[in-house]
Amino acid sequence: MNKRQRIGVSLIIGLMTLSVTAWAANNDPLTISADRLSYDGNSGRADAQGNVVITQQDKTMTGATGWYNTKTREAQLEGGVSMIGTDIAMSAETVHSINDNQFNATGAVHLQRQERQIFGDSVDYNTDTEYGKVTGNARLIAEGTTLTGNQVEGWLKEIRAVAQGDVTFTNSERNVSGSGDSATYTQTPNQNDGMVLLSGNAHAVQNGNVLNAPELKIRLADNSAETLGGRSTLVIVPNQ
């Protein structure tokens, strides 16, 4: 083994030792593997190229290239990124993480937490609070209801979402859909108490009947609707 090879092997061993040691202090060991690894001891940054795998606790992230900083606990992966955990999965083109719990994902993002899903061009998500902000082609699916908009903020732990811009919602089980400038959707997990508040040019269709108003409050449990904010119009379609 020549001098350059010995240095390369020592560098990789040093990288893995530093990574594990830094995380062992927090009882959360971390492992990085890749086709090529390099490490800057001054900055604490490890650069990885080719089949990158970062594993910590129950989460495994993979990508084509990436880096991790052992001092700042920051990481970034690019190129067909995926993250899989016990009850979470995410795919995107690029993922940047801070403190191992705050993620910014861009490029055809799909995140699933248990049975709840969010899609969009860009997603900011915190795994501790389960708060996510989706920008661009935003879509949230929870408890049978799909909510879309230019932007959607979601609190997945409590099932609460606020959508802005060209908003739509659908619930095929309840045979109801609607649209508006903005919407707020709330529901208690595993309870039949879902409610959608549409604001601004609110429009809803329930079992073929059409309702238009400045604001609409729709209760999914009994398919009831309440108009708010001004003059409203109801179009009733006779049973065929």
Residue ranges and their predicted role:
Residues 1-240:
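Mature-chain termini and adjacent capping regions
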